Amino acid sequence: MTIDTELTNGSSESVPFVFIGGGNMAAAIIKGCQNKGFTPKSNIVIGVQTEKSAEKWRQLGYKNVFTNTLEMLERYSTAIYVICVKPQVFEEVVSSWPVNSRPEFIISVMAGVPLKVLNAKLPFVSGNTTIVRLMPNVASSIGAGASTMCYEKNEKIMNQDSHIELAREFAECVGTVELIPERCFNPAMAIGGSSPAWTFMYIESLADGAVAQGLGRAEAKRLAAQAVLGAAQMVLNSNSGFDIETQHFGSLKDMVCSPGGTTIEGVRALEKNGFRYAVMEAVVAASTKADEMAKSLAK
């Protein structure tokens, strides 16, 4: 469907999505929007740094592609802006934004940049601007992402509820989305955003262990990946008999562990080597790093 966004002047018209940044995450989100029929290609505007990148987008059928951010933002003064760049270049984005701009709706897809910093660093943000933080993950590229979203409730902002609903639908184009308080954003982002890398390491380790015992590499990789996928589906699928809201993961583990069997022996080895502690520390480390990035940007 084409998105019709109610504007504060009372009119209703199709408003473009302006992506500031056209890297991997922007590509995943845009692809998801197209796959879900969320908004047409003609309604997508993309700002990139090089002509080579711009040409790649044009070859995919996107005509509204710019290498000059200021020119793009001046031309699209009424839009839903999606800041999809690395935090390190955020200041450059700010300096490229027209000072007389008064955006109504901004979606930030930047790790470690809190709402307070966004409000402070974007001097043109008015009291009528809805800012949403959104953090998808790499699985968004196949429509299986786990996104985290937060915003600051402000009843003075016209149409904020409709903006938030639109942001949720936008995020759901690439998977699931959890709306959470910002104080929980960094640990949630560590789980949703960073954990795929750790999960790849886990799958790789499973395969390596089997290869060490003589199993072929290809078979080991397929079995390991499918085992992890199946375990996740058992957690999320109510048909498995597991209730994620009320039951402990240990009940699923216990289903597999027979007394004196091979699985419980493997659990013992994992516990001996600090498996759970290592995973917990990875989440804490990623979350702490995001906190440090936020403090650095706030200076």
Curated annotation (Swiss-Prot):
Pathway: Amino-acid biosynthesis; L-proline biosynthesis; L-proline from L-glutamate 5-semialdehyde: step 1/1. GO terms for molecular function: pyrroline-5-carboxylate reductase activity. It catalyses: L-proline + NADP(+) = (S)-1-pyrroline-5-carboxylate + NADPH + 2 H(+); L-proline + NAD(+) = (S)-1-pyrroline-5-carboxylate + NADH + 2 H(+). It is an enzyme of class 1 (oxidoreductase). The keyword Heme does not apply. One of its GO terms (biological process) is L-proline biosynthetic process. NCBIfam families: proC (TIGR00112). InterPro entries: 6-PGluconate_DH-like_C_sf (IPR008927), NAD(P)-bd_dom_sf (IPR036291), P5C_Rdtase_cat_N (IPR028939), P5CR-like_CS (IPR053790), P5CR_dimer (IPR029036), Pyrroline-COOH_reductase (IPR000304). Belongs to the pyrroline-5-carboxylate reductase family. Gene3D superfamilies: NAD(P)-binding Rossmann-like Domain, ProC C-terminal domain-like. It comes from the Eukaryota. The keyword Amino-acid biosynthesis applies. Its EC number is 1.5.1.2. Keywords: Amino-acid biosynthesis, NADP, Oxidoreductase, Proline biosynthesis. This is Putative pyrroline-5-carboxylate reductase 4. It comes from Caenorhabditis elegans.
